[in-house]
Amino acid sequence: EKPTRFPARAEWVTDTTLATTLGNEDASLSTIEHLVAALRGMGIDNCTVEVSGPELPIMDGSAGSFVYLIQQAGVRAQARMRRRIVIRRPIEVRDGNRWVRVLPSRDFKVSVEIDYPHPVIGRQELESWVISPERFAREIAPARTFGFARDIGLLQRQGLALGGRFDNFVLFGEEGPVN
């Protein structure tokens, strides 16, 4: 059987309910966030990922396991220059009260703000960081994913989050962390 192929590009996103899913009419792949973060964080922009199921494994609940595997495999420069996207003016996209803004910069910098309707998470902000592969591996990749107890049933009925354990994500109940 010939494998189904699709690129990890925004136009291939088919669902973002509690996880990001890529796909086409033949197949889909869910929970791609940690792998995509590890690839970007480690400076990889061209690779092939082969999987045997509909969801990437959650492993330790972070991008750290993927970073470790990338470091063990090694990264090789390619003979061809990569295409770069150059941001020349601010770009902003809004969807209700959610937004993303991209600004011109020589470096890959990230500023993040979350305003989540949960008493423990609430509003948090991370000031602008320059992200190098070393900094990503050390300070960002180990951050574990979180989820809500109220969502576990829905995810598992969809065949997702089957690898979820108390040691690979932070679980929140209505009042705060459960684990």
Question: Model-flagged regions — what are they?
Answer:
Residues 1-45, 50-179:
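C-terminal regulatory domains involved in ligand/effector binding and gene-expression control
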